[in-house]
Amino acid sequence: MITTEIKRVKNHINGEWVESTGTEVEAVPNPATGKIIAYVPLSPKEDVEKAVEAAKAAYKTWSKVPVPNRSRQLYKYLQLLQENKEELAKIITLENGKTLTDATGEVQRGIEAVELATSAPNLMMGQALPNIASGIDGSIWRYPIGVVAGITPFNFPMMIPLWMFPLAIACGNTFVLKTSERTPLLAERLVELFYEAGFPKGVLNLVQGGKDVVNSILENKDIQAVSFVGSEPVARYVYETGTKNGKRVQALAGAKNHAVVMPDCNLEKTVQGVIGSAFASSGERCMACSVVAVVDEIADEFIDVLVAETKKLKVGDGFNEDNYVGPLIRESHKERVLGYINSGVADGATLLVDGRKINEEVGEGYFVGATIFDGVNQEMKIWQDEIFAPVLSIVRVKDLEEGIKLTNQSKFANGAVIYTSNGKHAQTFRDNIDAGMIGVNVNVPAPMAFFAFAGNKASFFGDLGTNGTDGVQFYTRKKVVTERWF
């Protein structure tokens, strides 16, 4: 339940809410108002060690629970999430700032991830081949790996944790969760509902905090695997440090997602698609469209319509259903984004829609409106860097080949989209683009939970992505058995 009182956030270890053993805390503001809504502990190493010990103890029995029973337990959790969808969405809007519409969509995507986890009995099935040699049978069996951990970002405080711990737990592991210190309240509610569903103590543990918690997770010898979603520099650090310490690591990193707009596209739907991808959730998502490569033949018409429609978007508190763009997560991030907009102007790009100039009614929140640049090139920081904001760069290209070449020049390769009505164009794009997730007339090509989620190049460090069969393989180890009976 959402209240107006300032909350002091706790950790959840071994089935109980406990104060951090440390004394350092960080204020959590509502991004739409700047007012403090909570204080979150910056937990020390000792709290992580306690959480790992609890998870180790729980693993001894949880890993032995029959797979269908674990699945049934998750069904109870799934039901509770569905029953509390409205409350969960409101918590997201309160502490993250995204509009209630966007938050509601996130809640549904998180629920879909839990639906995948309930199907673990099917996904964990092994393989067998009888009579591989005279009187000898061969088979592959999947087993849980032990205590695993997840480190998640602020921008999807429900969906991304639910990519991780339900599937890991369904596979028989126990879990230590470290969510962003910027959005601790939703994490609390997810854990409350988890134990309300009747799970044994210690199966899921929540440690709030910052860098010290991350480092403690990466260094703890009893944690077998780490899942991470966040920025490219931190993802690289998590991958290198975790693997150096003998852990299995999947680290989903930054992005600079491109869309190629072809002359044969459906103009109206393409414009609305680009707006939704670039500006919804205030652009704070790793699958947001941040660069449009538009073919010269349609460029002027596309840009005219895009600019006109973008100028209609309202900016403000996410609880107001008339608003399309909510606040950014923090004042410091707002200042960083304004710096990028200023650099684009200084570098010679044409500012078609200026998000620095927004209505005064938005108040004291961390607001930047939808922003569009034209005349952008690959030498500009606004093309090169992940800005993580409602800032869109337009590059004009002569044809599909140049659009693909431009897209592949980015160091990132998370998602990419083509807008076209030509199947051959779509096929050429699919076969030649570097991105790990590709959309054809799909604005945000983030796959459903039963498909793997992972980019390429500097957008992903590791081998197996989250979700789908990749997720099951990541959270299990296989044993190959060759047997003969006399």
Curated annotation (Swiss-Prot):
Keyword terms: NAD, Oxidoreductase
Annotated Gene3D superfamilies: Aldehyde Dehydrogenase, Chain A, domain 1 (3.40.605.10), Aldehyde Dehydrogenase, Chain A, domain 2 (3.40.309.10)
One BP annotation, GO: inositol catabolic process
Cross-referenced SUPFAM superfamilies: ALDH-like (SSF53720)
Active site: C286
Protein task: Catalyzes the oxidation of malonate semialdehyde (MSA) and methylmalonate semialdehyde (MMSA) into acetyl-CoA and propanoyl-CoA, respectively. Is involved in a myo-inositol catabolic pathway. Bicarbonate, and not CO2, is the end-product of the enzymatic reaction.
Reaction catalysis annotation: 3-oxopropanoate + NAD(+) + CoA + H2O = hydrogencarbonate + acetyl-CoA + NADH + H(+); 2-methyl-3-oxopropanoate + NAD(+) + CoA + H2O = propanoyl-CoA + hydrogencarbonate + NADH + H(+)
UniProt subunit comment: Homotetramer.
PANTHER family, alphabetized: MALONATE-SEMIALDEHYDE DEHYDROGENASE
Record pathway: Polyol metabolism; myo-inositol degradation into acetyl-CoA; acetyl-CoA from myo-inositol: step 7/7
Pfam family, one: Aldedh
Superkingdom of origin: Bacteria
Top EC category: oxidoreductase
GO molecular function: malonate-semialdehyde dehydrogenase (acetylating) activity; methylmalonate-semialdehyde dehydrogenase (acylating, NAD) activity
The name this protein goes by in its record: Malonate-semialdehyde dehydrogenase 1
Residues binding NAD(+), per UniProt: F154, K178, E181, R182, S231, E386
EC number annotated for this UniProt entry: 1.2.1.27
Keyword flag 4Fe-4S: no
Family the entry assigns: Belongs to the aldehyde dehydrogenase family. IolA subfamily.
